[in-house]
Amino acid sequence: MSAPISQALWDARIPLLITHPLAPTTPFITSIPRFSYLALLLPRLSAFFNTPCSSFHFEDVVLRNLPVGLLVDLYQPSLPWRLIVNDGVSWDISDTFLNAAKEADFIRNGNANQIMKLSKDDTRQLWHAVIDNDLAAFSRINNRLLNAPTALKHVPMRIYLPLAPGGSAGGDVGEPTVDQQQGGGDASAAGAFKIIQSLVQPLGADRRPRLLGQVLRETMPKLFPSSRDPVMANVLLHGVAVPFNAPLADLMREAAYFDGWLSFVVVVL
């Protein structure tokens, strides 16, 4: 990662105002890095509200264990982000992170050898760097994952497509999808979205770097009829629109989330 870009991403924070149904007038006010998980707040919230807390709700949506910045890009809340915490479905957040990082490693290399070769202590340090929002400690381990001895095979890239009520995304976009949806698999549920994923090579047949706009047009041609400019939709990454002429391999190194994924959110214009 370029130091100024990566430091800016790790420094960015989201202000939160969190309440519990048992104490609606006593909010827990804090901020959290965009490069973090809401679930890391649960021990503090359980102590603050003096009751078990394991799930977060925004309006009528039960939030998944995605990076905070990705959730903000998906739901576009006003700030401070007003959340409700309660007892409900919970996940082991360290497993969530490690599984996502393994998937990204497999996509990059065709195997997960790089991350599987990490020692137990290295894996622990990688996770604790996320917990501590420690870019320097994270980079010491993550650079070994990004600099494999073999050439990059594919770019770990997912496109999150918010769905309107009824499961529509503004028409049939004809995209390959991963079988994951917010809302318990119910595409008509509040806050539902599709995750679109395909194998994206870093170089084209002409050996030139693949650009974001090219891949968007190939993947979702009805939403992205132009590979040069946003016409019907744009994509957000870390809260900002991404230039369509950005090389994907460079984006991966400069702006992937801590789990190794480029996670774009579609915004229909």
Curated annotation (Swiss-Prot):
InterPro entries in alphabetical order: Atg5, ATG5_HBR, Atg5_HR, ATG5_UblA, Atg5_UblA_dom_sf, ATG5_UblB
Main location, first listed in the record: membrane
UniProt induction comment: Expression is reduced when the vacuolar protein VLP4 is absent.
PTM field: Conjugated to ATG12; which is essential for autophagy. Conjugation with ATG12 involves ATG7 as an E1-like activating enzyme and ATG10 as an E2-like conjugating enzyme.
Gene Ontology cellular component terms for the protein in this record: Atg12-Atg5-Atg16 complex; autophagosome; mitochondria-associated endoplasmic reticulum membrane contact site; phagophore; phagophore assembly site membrane
Topology term for the membrane: Peripheral membrane protein
GO molecular function: Atg8-family ligase activity
Subcellular localization(s) per the UniProt record: Preautophagosomal structure membrane
Consequence of gene loss (knockout): Blocks autophagy and displays increased sensitivity to nutrient limitation, with decreased conidial germination, growth and sporulation. Leads only to a modest decrease in virulence.
Keywords assigned: Autophagy, Isopeptide bond, Membrane, Protein transport, Transport, Ubl conjugation
Covalent link (Glycyl lysine isopeptide (Lys-Gly) (interchain with G-Cter in ATG12)) residue numbers: K102
Gene Ontology BP annotations: autophagy of mitochondrion; cellular response to nitrogen starvation; piecemeal microautophagy of the nucleus; protein transport
UniProt record similarity statement: Belongs to the ATG5 family.
PANTHER family on file: AUTOPHAGY PROTEIN 5
Function text: Involved in cytoplasm to vacuole transport (Cvt) and autophagic vesicle formation. Autophagy is essential for maintenance of amino acid levels and protein synthesis under nitrogen starvation. Required for selective autophagic degradation of the nucleus (nucleophagy). Also required for mitophagy, which eliminates defective or superfluous mitochondria in order to fulfill cellular energy requirements and prevent excess ROS production.
Subunit relationships: Conjugated with ATG12. The ATG5-ATG12 conjugate forms a complex with several units of ATG16. The ATG12-ATG5 conjugate also associates with ATG3.
Protein name: Autophagy-related protein 5
Organism for this UniProt entry: Beauveria bassiana (strain ARSEF 2860)
